[in-house]
Amino acid sequence: MAKKVQAYVKLQVAAGMANPSPPVGPALGQQGVNIMEFCKAFNAKTDSIEKGLPIPVVITVYADRSFTFVTKTPPAAVLLKKAAGIKSGSGKPNKDKVGKISRAQLQQIAQTKAADMTGADIEAMTRSIEGTARSMGLVVED
């Protein structure tokens, strides 16, 4: 028989840097989950990813206080900022441009995000990432 699901907890945790401090501790503590067990498992799973990159994670908490979790790919905005070498996007994206990004970089980001995106093909996903880049104040170059 399947376990009864108690809650789903969605967080963004830095890769390889999960610890019991906020936001992880309070979110999991409310559900009665062993926080250190999650931190160790998450850090082990995100070993191969660049440290400090925010990783969205969905934690399924069961009635017996056990848990499973699924990691996603980093947010597109974070990958775009890293590729363009900027700290933050533009406050006025249509007026102030903060950086440039090539179409090849957009395709590479779309490939990275492909597992989590619901696009028809890689071209559609690239266009979606391109829209995110433009709304951040990045200029897309061919």
UniProtKB/Swiss-Prot annotation:
Post-translational modification: One or more lysine residues are methylated.
GO biological process, one term: translation
Residue spans crossing the bilayer: none
GO cellular component terms, semicolon-separated: cytosolic large ribosomal subunit
Modified residues (N,N,N-trimethylalanine): A2
Residues annotated with N6,N6,N6-trimethyllysine modification: K4, K40
Domain of life of the source: Bacteria
GO molecular function terms noted in the UniProt entry: large ribosomal subunit rRNA binding; structural constituent of ribosome
Pfam families the UniProt entry points to: Ribosomal_L11, Ribosomal_L11_N
Record key words, sorted: Methylation, Ribonucleoprotein, Ribosomal protein, RNA-binding, rRNA-binding
SUPFAM superfamilies in UniProt: Ribosomal L11/L12e N-terminal domain (SSF54747), Ribosomal protein L11, C-terminal domain (SSF46906)
Function noted in UniProt: Forms part of the ribosomal stalk which helps the ribosome interact with GTP-bound translation factors.
Complexes and interactors: Part of the ribosomal stalk of the 50S ribosomal subunit. Interacts with L10 and the large rRNA to form the base of the stalk. L10 forms an elongated spine to which L12 dimers bind in a sequential fashion forming a multimeric L10(L12)X complex.
Family: Belongs to the universal ribosomal protein uL11 family.
Protein name: Large ribosomal subunit protein uL11
Species this protein is from: Shigella flexneri
Taxonomic lineage of the native organism: Bacteria, Pseudomonadati, Pseudomonadota, Gammaproteobacteria, Enterobacterales
Gene assigned in the entry: rplK
